[in-house]
């Protein structure tokens, strides 16, 4: 019989206490996605993967992550080059500001941590562009330190399992208390896989879910995941957006500086120079583009590649 919302709300309980860890871990071992970064415990490799996964589809990251690590196999190799080289390698993954932050983070790791990615969450979160989720993910997947990761998939599972909308703190507390001792890596990967494969956003496969007989929602009534903290909604259209123009310009600049006269064409808006200048201003503010004598360039490539 499914757990009622009242039963869940009445006690401070957790997935780990109410469901035998082996129950879910068995499903995880049989359904684990074959993702290349899961074979690595190298903190730098894991950090790169997690930064990429923040806002890029898993299949796209699986394609680009190995290539990025060939170019930048360790912290030192990333920190030692101009930002332009990291941005150029990142181009095509979207949200290119992440490349700037990753380059800055590599510099901080070299300067303050002797080139070693730190283990402590506070030190990880002090790195540029690294928030609580990414810090927890590095701890769990590289260092295998007791930590629970709550992305949109896990937040959705927790909301449905409890049958109610959760605040970010409630979701994180539930996840933190649920990690079986000594199984931090496999437990977190299993929850991520469950959310990606079975407890999906649009068409959850409740009949095949290993949590179905203990789930408060079980596909009946209003979905409690809607409106829960951490559960993402739909993205705004990419086609014709400022983001598309930003990406086009960064891709063009990977080949060298772009003159002011070519700016609008490079961004895909040949008839809208005002828009091009407005949007390039945001790229300059984000540290992705610099103004140079020949027009615009990636930082560090003002004189050409």
PLM feature spans:
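Short, contiguous pre-domain boundary segments
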Residues: 1-13, 32-33, 230
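Catalytic cores of DNA base-excision repair glycosylases
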Residues: 22-244, 252, 257, 266-273, ...
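Short amphipathic alpha-helical interaction segments
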Residues: 270-284
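A short, conserved structural fragment
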Residues: 284-296
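Accessory beta->alpha helical hairpin/"wing" motif in late/C-terminal subdomains of nucleic-acid enzymes
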Residues: 294-304
């Amino acid at each position: 019989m499914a757990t009622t919302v009242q039963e869940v709300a009445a006690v401070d309980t957790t997935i780990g206490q109410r469901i035998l860890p082996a129950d879910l871990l068995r499903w995880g071992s049989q359904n684990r996605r074959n993702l290349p970064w899961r074979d690595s415990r190298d903190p730098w490799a894991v950090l790169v993967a997690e930064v990429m996964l923040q806002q890029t589809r898993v299949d796209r990251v699986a394609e680009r992550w190995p290539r990025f690590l060939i170019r930048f196999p360790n912290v030192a190799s990333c920190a030692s080059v101009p930002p332009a080289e990291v941005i150029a390698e990142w181009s095509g993954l979207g949200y290119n500001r992440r490349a700037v932050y990753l380059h800055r983070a590599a510099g901080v790791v070299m300067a303050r941590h002797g080139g070693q990615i730190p283990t402590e969450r506070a030190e990880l979160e002090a790195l540029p562009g690294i928030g609580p989720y990414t810090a927890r993910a590095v701890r769990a997947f590289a260092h295998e330190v007791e930590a629970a990761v709550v992305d949109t998939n896990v937040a959705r599972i927790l909301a449905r399992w409890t049958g109610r909308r959760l605040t970010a703190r409630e979701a994180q507390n539930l996840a933190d208390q649920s990690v079986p001792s000594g199984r931090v890596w496999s437990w977190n990967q299993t929850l991520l896989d469950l959310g990606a494969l079975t407890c999906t956003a649009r068409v959850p496969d409740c009949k095949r879910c290993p949590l179905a007989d203990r789930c408060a929602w079980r596909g009946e009534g209003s979905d409690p995941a809607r409106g829960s903290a951490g559960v993402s909604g739909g993205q705004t259209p990419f086609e014709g957006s400022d983001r598309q123009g930003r990406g086009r310009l960064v891709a063009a600049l990977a080949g060298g500086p772009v003159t002011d006269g070519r700016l609008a064409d490079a961004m895909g808006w040949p008839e809208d120079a005002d828009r091009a200048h407005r949007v390039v201003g945001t790229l300059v503010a984000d540290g992705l583009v610099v103004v140079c004598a020949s027009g615009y360039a990636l930082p560090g490539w003002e004189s050409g590649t």
